[in-house]
């Protein structure tokens, strides 16, 4: 594959002029984290606009998530790498520098990021855990639609290097490039300005670093990734503001659909008003695998 971006004019299809098509990957992260999230994801896919989900292979409800995925073959399922705020696949004695006595990663993403970057002794452990999570995904026999990370940790240089080195062997073809345009987001939503500016800066820098490396490996990514700066506030109102602004190309929107704390995101995915805008604009909902 020579092309890398699924952005404007790259590999789009639809209508009489593929270069003018608007395609939207609608993804739910944290598939398998809980039964509540699993139910929301299945409902959003069957009744709403959700096209894909990212599986936490060590999540408390991962087995149920796999059953749901098998029962819904049009749901694109990717691997949601977890290296912070979650449980590891490998036993603690294999990765003692990464997990506590209960086999869980730290809940402090800043601390984790600094340790993974500045402690060379942890790099082999990070690599082993990443590969173990890929092996766990492969054991499900589900097609790998894409790869991303919990809290977008897949763009951390230490994790990203493993992805690049092993992409061919592991069957990775599409990776989330987490770049949510700040100026556009400030126009579309309100509040949490410190969070939005800081995350735009951090992930903007990581995306700029990662983009040419993805290109070198022929790995695909969307033109932009919406949802990062919303911090689990992907609401109906936000989508009704965002969708009219989408330009030709392929874009990703991600959320954390759930029946509990994030029910507003489930409701946004089920919204008839949102579907009406999608249809009125001719926006095609798709999976990463549809864009290759």
What are these regions (language model features)?
Residues 2-26, 31, 35-146, 157-292:
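Terminal accessory/targeting
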Residues 154:
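Residue-level signal for short amphipathic helical patches enriched in basic/charged
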Residues 148-151:
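Active-site histidine-anchored catalytic micro-motif
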């Amino acid at each position: 594959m020579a092309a890398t971006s699924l952005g404007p004019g790259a590999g789009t299809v639809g209508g009489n002029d593929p270069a003018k098509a608007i395609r939207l990957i609608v993804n739910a992260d944290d598939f398998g984290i809980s039964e509540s999230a699993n139910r929301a994801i299945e409902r959003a896919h069957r009744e709403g606009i959700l096209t894909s989900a990212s599986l936490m292979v060590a999540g408390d409800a991962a087995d149920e998530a796999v059953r749901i995925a098998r029962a819904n073959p049009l749901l694109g399922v990717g691997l949601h790498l977890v290296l912070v705020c979650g449980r590891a696949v490998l036993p603690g004695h294999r990765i003692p520098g990464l997990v506590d006595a209960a086999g869980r990663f730290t809940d402090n993403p800043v601390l984790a990021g600094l340790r993974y970057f500045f402690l060379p002794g942890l790099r082999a452990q990070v690599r082993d855990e990443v590969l173990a999570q890929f092996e766990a995904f492969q054991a499900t026999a589900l097609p790998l639609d894409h790869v991303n990370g919990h809290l977008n940790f897949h763009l951390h240089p230490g994790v990203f290097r493993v992805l690049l080195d092993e992409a061919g062997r592991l069957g990775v073809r599409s990776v989330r490039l987490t770049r949510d345009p700040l100026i556009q987001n400030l126009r579309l939503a309100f509040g949490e300005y410190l969070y939005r500016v800081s995350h735009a800066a951090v992930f903007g820098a990581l995306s700029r670093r990662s983009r040419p490396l993805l290109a070198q490996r022929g790995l695909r990514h969307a033109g932009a990734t919406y949802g990062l700066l919303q911090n689990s506030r992907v609401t109906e109102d936000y989508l009704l503001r965002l969708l009219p602004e989408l330009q030709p190309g392929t874009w990703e929107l991600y959320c954390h659909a759930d029946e509990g704390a994030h029910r507003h995101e489930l409701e946004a995915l089920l919204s008839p008003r949102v579907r009406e805008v999608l249809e009125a604009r001719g926006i095609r909902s798709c999976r990463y695998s549809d864009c290759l």
